[in-house]
């Protein structure tokens, strides 16, 4: 879809200026092209561009640069002067050390005696030269003396040795396995040769090391010769089974500790196998004996443990019967057992059985005292006052709010019911709730009547009486 062209508001003068500028640029381009073709290069164009903000310098930069240049020139001058002064001083010191003074008066101006220093230096040089000459002379004398001693020893060894009285003491020269020339008495020669032979056996080069000194053709030839010898030996032997050692042929693989290299000879191989079988049987027999001994020891130990368990069970049974008799308040004699009639099942439902357990490391009836509590005073008494008396003595200011006791009115029916405990004495039946009582003492002191058909019970008027009673018992 073609869009309509918007009319441009351009004056005639601007169009004429644009056309003139275009014509001028075309003429300039033609002139540059003609100059380039003719080999004449025109002047570079001068760009009248506006300088950017980065090309501008800060104020005072040029003045500071001039000051820095002047300061550097001054520093360079002072450096040159100081260098000249130092060079003059070095030359003067060199002359003084050599003794070249301009005047004796000038020499007295300095604190250092350069003349004495020159004399001392010359003396040191003379001493060093003398010591060096003496050391060189001593070394020469020592070398000459050593040479004379060697000559004397040779002359003594060759001329002054007396002739041997016995032929076995005659000195003999021989060459050992390492190619060294040796001298010894004739009587020591056999032992030395034997030692040399042993040493040569130790220094035997293995075939693996010899291979590195051979070429490939020589190695193949040696392998072929070895194979031919083995085949000849195999042809001489009778036909039989082939073993691993027959085909191993210098195998480089290490087969471990459990591998045993049997001999290739049949008789020797059978002998080795019999020996190994005998050793295996001895090992199995010893292992079986050791296992039997372990089983016997284990059986003896189990028997001992069973006896100990039986003894502990007997002791626990006896202790259990004694504890039951203490809980019931009756001391039974094991020699004269008496049959006690069992209570009816209806009475058991309303009884509470109490089992008193005491420590075995303490006496019955006596509380256990720890090691760190011995010698201390303790009171093992019971509360002598009831809860009602304690509440009466309490200051009403510290009493709890009255609404806490609203829900306790329902417990009246429970408190009216009598509480009973088996095994109590009949003397405890008539005690009232308002009096302080000790039912545990009466319970343990008064035995149960044998003629009664069932065990007497203890009745409690209130819940507090029952709780205090069980606190005293336990």
From Swiss-Prot:
<keyword id="KW-0175">Coiled coil</keyword>
<keyword id="KW-0597">Phosphoprotein</keyword>
<feature type="coiled-coil region">
    <location>
        <begin position="64"/>
        <end position="98"/>
    </location>
</feature>
<keyword id="KW-0539">Nucleus</keyword>
<feature type="modified residue" description="Phosphoserine">
    <location>
        <position position="206"/>
    </location>
</feature>
<feature type="region of interest" description="Disordered">
    <location>
        <begin position="129"/>
        <end position="170"/>
    </location>
</feature>
<dbReference type="Pfam" id="PF13300">
    <property type="entry name" value="DUF4078"/>
</dbReference>
<feature type="compositionally biased region" description="Basic and acidic residues">
    <location>
        <begin position="356"/>
        <end position="372"/>
    </location>
</feature>
<dbReference type="Pfam" id="PF25449">
    <property type="entry name" value="CCDC174_GRSR"/>
</dbReference>
<feature type="region of interest" description="Disordered">
    <location>
        <begin position="309"/>
        <end position="372"/>
    </location>
</feature>
<feature type="compositionally biased region" description="Low complexity">
    <location>
        <begin position="430"/>
        <end position="453"/>
    </location>
</feature>
<feature type="compositionally biased region" description="Acidic residues">
    <location>
        <begin position="148"/>
        <end position="157"/>
    </location>
</feature>
<feature type="region of interest" description="Disordered">
    <location>
        <begin position="39"/>
        <end position="86"/>
    </location>
</feature>
<feature type="compositionally biased region" description="Basic and acidic residues">
    <location>
        <begin position="316"/>
        <end position="327"/>
    </location>
</feature>
<feature type="region of interest" description="Disordered">
    <location>
        <begin position="389"/>
        <end position="461"/>
    </location>
</feature>
<dbReference type="InterPro" id="IPR025066">
    <property type="entry name" value="CCDC174-like"/>
</dbReference>
<comment type="function">
    <text>Probably involved in neuronal development.</text>
</comment>
<dbReference type="GO" id="GO:0005634">
    <property type="term" value="C:nucleus"/>
</dbReference>
<feature type="compositionally biased region" description="Polar residues">
    <location>
        <begin position="410"/>
        <end position="419"/>
    </location>
</feature>
<protein>
    <recommendedName>
        <fullName>Coiled-coil domain-containing protein 174</fullName>
    </recommendedName>
</protein>
<feature type="compositionally biased region" description="Basic and acidic residues">
    <location>
        <begin position="64"/>
        <end position="86"/>
    </location>
</feature>
<feature type="compositionally biased region" description="Basic and acidic residues">
    <location>
        <begin position="129"/>
        <end position="142"/>
    </location>
</feature>
<feature type="coiled-coil region">
    <location>
        <begin position="276"/>
        <end position="317"/>
    </location>
</feature>
